[in-house]
Amino acid sequence: MRDLKTYLSVAPVLSTLWFGALAGLLIEINRFFPDALTFPFFSF
């Protein structure tokens, strides 16, 4: 039961950090490539 409580307290923190980092990455990509449907570094 203690392991379950530890998991339930760690998972929201990790997911908040992960989604915050992902949102920051998307914001920075949109800052350098605004309104891009295709990114120049993905086109071959």
From Swiss-Prot:
It is a single-pass membrane protein. It is found in: Plastid, Chloroplast thylakoid membrane. InterPro entries: PSI_PsaJ (IPR002615), PSI_PsaJ_sf (IPR036062). It comes from the Eukaryota. GO terms for biological process: photosynthesis. GO terms for cellular component: chloroplast thylakoid membrane; photosystem I. Its main location: plastid. The chain crosses the membrane at residues 7-27. Keywords: Chloroplast, Membrane, Photosynthesis, Photosystem I, Plastid, Thylakoid, Transmembrane, Transmembrane helix. May help in the organization of the PsaE and PsaF subunits. HAMAP family: PSI_PsaJ. Belongs to the PsaJ family. This is Photosystem I reaction center subunit IX.
